[in-house]
Each structure stands twice: as C-alpha cells, then as structure tokens.
UniProtKB/Swiss-Prot annotation:
Residues 46 form a propeptide. Belongs to the conotoxin I1 superfamily. It is found in: Secreted. InterPro entries: Conotoxin-I_CS, Toxin_19. Disulfide bonds join C5-C19, C12-C22, C18-C27, C21-C38. Expressed by the venom duct. This is Iota-conotoxin-like R11.2. It comes from the Eukaryota. GO terms for molecular function: sodium channel regulator activity; toxin activity. GO terms for cellular component: extracellular region. The modification D-methionine is found at M44.
Amino acid sequence: GAVPCGKDGRQCRNHADCCNCCPIGTCAPSTNWILPGCSTGPFMTR
C-alpha cells in the first residue's frame, strides 16, 4: 500500500521513492540501524 508523503503528496511505494519507507509503505526517518529508513510509526517529510 502506498501512502502520500512529502509536501507534494507523491505516493511512496519503496525505499527512497520520495522519502524513506518501509517495504509496507510506511514513511519513516532513517534512524533505524537494523532496518534503515524503517520505523514503527508514520513520518511525513517536509
């Protein structure tokens, strides 16, 4: 499932599509050492 992210609302389907994303499409900051770009919570880039 893609989720809108970024200020232009592009669809985020995979890592670095428009922001850092988990495989499931959750946008997240790149602070997870084990799964870079993944997080348990949503994150909208500015």
